[in-house]
Amino acid sequence: MNNECVIGIDIGGTNIRIGRTDENDQLVDFERVSSKETFKDGNISESLTEVLKNYLDKYCKNVQVKQIAIGIPATLSSDRKQILQVPNIKGMDGLFLGKELEENLGIPVVLEKDVNMLYYWDKYDKKLSDEGVGIGVYIGTGVGNAIFINGKPLAGKDGVAGELGHIPMIGGTSQCGCGNLGCSECYASGWKLVELKEEYYPDVDMNDLFVKKSNDTVLKNFVDNIACVACAEINILNPDSI
């Protein structure tokens, strides 16, 4: 048995996914819990600490955890210490989550935007070059966007670069979770697709939605909205890969 590991956590608006990798970067264990259930009492740090303690007790009694890496669908400070805003999860805004978890668990914790972690994996898995500009557009609960320049994520002065899901759409009036009106993820996101499914296709399983209804105008407009958002960034950055 390998005696060291790294724990990776993906905190989403729907689920929290936790995995452990061994010294060969191979996934050893994986669990998924409900974000809504975990954070229902509003005490984010303590609730997540409890989830992690249970995971550590179950899988890591005989190994040394070198680090916990957490991906969050949030805007983070440029030093990646503070969560600035999480539109789709209440109670996280302003938290120094990494510091609080380190104090509770005694294990080093790093925070990063979830989409940047996704792009790191895609870059590794698809053997993408570090040279030039690479972008990733990820449709989850919201719209995630990673911008990498010469192998490093673009954070911007305040850490909020690349918030593609919160670009205002012309004529948009829908209320976004961030507090603004007409953000792109109000029209092109996972939660918008769920909303459309419930309104127009209540009897169709989500997994079969595009198989059975791909020619419907409602879904075509949804796909066009995603394409519009992605194309805007492509035209601005002229990336080497997407």
Language-model segments: which ranges?
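ATP-binding/phosphotransfer module of carbohydrate and carboxylate kinases, centering on a glycine-rich
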Residues: 1-67, 76-82, 99-107, 123-131, ...
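Phosphate-binding/catalytic loop of phosphoryl-transfer enzymes
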Residues: 67-69, 75-179, 183-184
